Amino acid sequence: MPFRSNNPITRDELLSRFFPQYHPVTTFNSGLSGGSFLIEHQGQRFVVRQPHDPDAPQSAFLRQYRALSQLPACIAPKPHLYLRDWMVVDYLPGAVKTYLPDTNELAGLLYYLHQQPRFGWRITLLPLLELYWQQSDPARRTVGWLRMLKRLRKAREPRPLRLSPLHMDVHAGNLVHSASGLKLIDWEYAGDGDIALELAAVWVENTEQHRQLVNDYATRAKIYPAQLWRQVRRWFPWLLMLKAGWFEYRWRQTGDQQFIRLADDTWRQLLIKQ
């Protein structure tokens, strides 16, 4: 149920107008990008979400709502309300673990997602890389960062192997192990893109796990594993730059020291992989 309004409302106004019988249960963090809170009434629970990035355009939040509206409930929470700065979605019962599931199970989830109809908007990384450069702390901008940005701009993004709807933030904290199977939460970066980009972006523990995930996916997608792995590797520099830039951007935005540590670690990975 989308609800259009140019006037922002408070949390209490949201609850009193749309969920008068519900009460907040708890606030929880669902990843590095922000928090949400639960509301409940007679055992029924919803998650109330706000944009993780207060500086992002409103269209980005609306896209997340549209993505959730068209995804099947077996892999994503269904949305119930959207209005400026607020979204209410189903609460997904289950366990959120600190490690990834079996690679074959995860490959099955991603392959099923990639078989769904496209969202209708493309994921393009270069504008994000340039935005993070421009919005980062000037003292943190280095010659090496600018050189890599220019190199990627000249090279252009890899041509997609297969174009599909992507989640683009697959890590242990965004996977719910439910009684009916794996489900994904936090769809704020969703869009259409290369399946290899999704696979490259998964937050794996090591290269061995990454290759096994790609192999399991290739079996389902009927792609030569070596061909898919080559395409995944083409995306590595783009994704490392994306992560490093996002951490730098969030550091300037929040002042949270964890983002500096994560940025420094990602820059080191970039140097190793060059």
From Swiss-Prot:
GO terms for molecular function: ATP binding; thiamine kinase activity. InterPro entries: Aminoglycoside_PTrfase, Kinase-like_dom_sf, Thiamine_kinase. Pathway: Cofactor biosynthesis; thiamine diphosphate biosynthesis; thiamine phosphate from thiamine: step 1/1. It catalyses: thiamine + ATP = thiamine phosphate + ADP + H(+). GO terms for biological process: thiamine diphosphate biosynthetic process; thiamine metabolic process. It holds the Pfam family APH. Disulfide bonds: none annotated. Its EC number is 2.7.1.89. Keywords: ATP-binding, Kinase, Nucleotide-binding, Transferase. Catalyzes the ATP-dependent phosphorylation of thiamine to thiamine phosphate. Is involved in thiamine salvage. HAMAP family: Thiamine_kinase (MF_01604). Belongs to the thiamine kinase family. This is Thiamine kinase. It comes from Escherichia coli (strain K12).
